[in-house]
């Protein structure tokens, strides 16, 4: 995908722009690898309570550097400035350890799009957190994100080998990727189709199963039609608790997740999941805000496509701004006549 006949000019980024989080860095790493364009970013996560690079961000940088043979400056804990100059993307067998409960999914979402266009198949194992309230859980990637990528021509599988909850981590995810034969196909996702299933799962590891049962009962009371089940993991994978709701529609599956914490009632966890799900179900949008965040980059790589979403989050608009610095695309976000829906178009 990249063109290295002439040295590409370095792109300058402000890590505090827009939403100001780690997504700016991750998107820049992905697109830098894919386009062969070096970048420099200042003020990384400057507005956060702990600014600069944290362990999961460092792991994403190190993973991108290994996949692309990049030259990197500033890859240190707490650093608020980073320079990244990529080389060619190489497929292979990779293993990355975050060392904390930092998100495996965010590291994977940094390097996987590059490996879609590598010179050989790849496997990527990442250890760390798999169920973390600050990032999409692995369930979301497997059941919401991955099927839509497959429709665009991506051949990729994700397997959850071991759960990793905050704060201990210790989880592992394995991804396998076969490079794409050509450019990604455009995805047009403006309707979600008929509702087929509402499936709730209460996951517990070294936590009483009664907690999951209470969560599911409270969820079913708020969201009619939910069919729930309790999943007990090995105590060694805990302590941890997650409540996961899949809204399976004809054209898309959305995944909503809440996480149990010490001192937080099970009913409160269920209330959060139910509120997010009902906002989506009561709209006519094809996707919720978090899936919208994750779709815009592959759509930009395809060069075309559109989807409707519940809202245009600050994450989404900031991501769009970074994408447009690296790729010759124009991405518009417009409110539909239905005030609960926005339309995102890639041209």
Curated annotation (Swiss-Prot):
rRNA processing keyword on record: no
Biological processes per GO annotation: RNA processing
Classification via CDD domains: RNA_Cyclase_Class_II
Enzyme active site: 315
Keyword Cell membrane in record: no
Record: residues binding ATP: 109, 290-294
Annotated compartments: Cytoplasm
InterPro entries linked: RNA3'-term_phos_cycl_insert (IPR013791), RNA3'_phos_cyclase_dom (IPR023797), RNA3'_phos_cyclase_dom_sf (IPR037136), RNA3'_term_phos_cyc (IPR000228), RNA3'_term_phos_cyc_type_1 (IPR017770), RNA3'_term_phos_cycl-like_CS (IPR020719), RNA3'P_cycl/enolpyr_Trfase_a/b (IPR013792), RPTC_insert (IPR036553)
Catalytic reaction equation(s): a 3'-end 3'-phospho-ribonucleotide-RNA + ATP = a 3'-end 2',3'-cyclophospho-ribonucleotide-RNA + AMP + diphosphate
PROSITE patterns attached to this UniProt entry: RTC
EC number: 6.5.1.4
Pfam family, one: RTC_insert
Job of this protein: Catalyzes the conversion of 3'-phosphate to a 2',3'-cyclic phosphodiester at the end of RNA. The mechanism of action of the enzyme occurs in 3 steps: (A) adenylation of the enzyme by ATP; (B) transfer of adenylate to an RNA-N3'P to produce RNA-N3'PP5'A; (C) and attack of the adjacent 2'-hydroxyl on the 3'-phosphorus in the diester linkage to produce the cyclic end product. The biological role of this enzyme is unknown but it is likely to function in some aspects of cellular RNA processing.
Family under the similarity heading: Belongs to the RNA 3'-terminal cyclase family. Type 1 subfamily.
Protein name, as recorded: RNA 3'-terminal phosphate cyclase
């Amino acid at each position: 995908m990249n063109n290295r006949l002439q040295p590409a000019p370095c792109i300058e980024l402000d890590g505090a722009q827009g939403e100001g989080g780690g997504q700016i860095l991750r998107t820049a790493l992905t697109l830098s690898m894919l386009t062969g364009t070096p970048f420099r970013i200042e003020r990384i996560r400057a507005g956060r309570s702990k600014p600069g690079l944290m362990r999961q961000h460092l792991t994403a940088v190190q993973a991108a550097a290994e996949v692309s043979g990049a030259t990197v400056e500033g890859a240190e804990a707490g650093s608020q400035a980073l320079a990244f100059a990529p080389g060619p993307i190489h497929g292979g067998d990779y293993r990355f350890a975050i060392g904390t409960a930092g998100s495996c999914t965010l590291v994977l979402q940094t390097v996987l799009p590059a490996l879609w266009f590598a010179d050989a198949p790849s496997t990527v194992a990442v250890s760390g957190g798999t169920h973390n309230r600050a990032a999409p859980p692995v369930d979301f990637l497997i059941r919401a994100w991955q099927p839509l990528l497959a429709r665009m021509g991506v051949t990729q599988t994700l397997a959850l080998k071991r759960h990793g909850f905050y704060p201990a981590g210790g989880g592992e995810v394995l991804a396998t990727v076969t490079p794409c034969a050509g450019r990604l196909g455009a995805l047009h996702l403006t309707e979600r189709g008929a509702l087929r299933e509402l499936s709730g799962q209460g996951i517990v590891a070294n936590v009483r199963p009664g907690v999951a049962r209470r969560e599911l009962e409270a969820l079913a009371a708020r969201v009619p039609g939910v069919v729930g089940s309790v999943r007990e993991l090995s105590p060694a994978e805990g302590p941890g608790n997650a409540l996961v709701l899949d809204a399976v529609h004809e054209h898309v599956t959305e995944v909503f997740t809440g996480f149990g914490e010490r001192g937080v009632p099970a009913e409160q966890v269920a209330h959060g999941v139910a509120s997010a799900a009902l906002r989506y179900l009561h709209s006519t949008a094809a996707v919720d805000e978090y899936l919208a965040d994750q779709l815009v980059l592959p759509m930009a790589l395809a060069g075309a496509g559109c989807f409707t979403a519940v809202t245009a989050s600050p994450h989404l608009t900031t991501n769009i701004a970074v994408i447009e610095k690296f790729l010759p695309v124009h991405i518009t976000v417009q409110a539909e006549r239905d005030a609960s829906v926005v339309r995102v178009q890639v041209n």
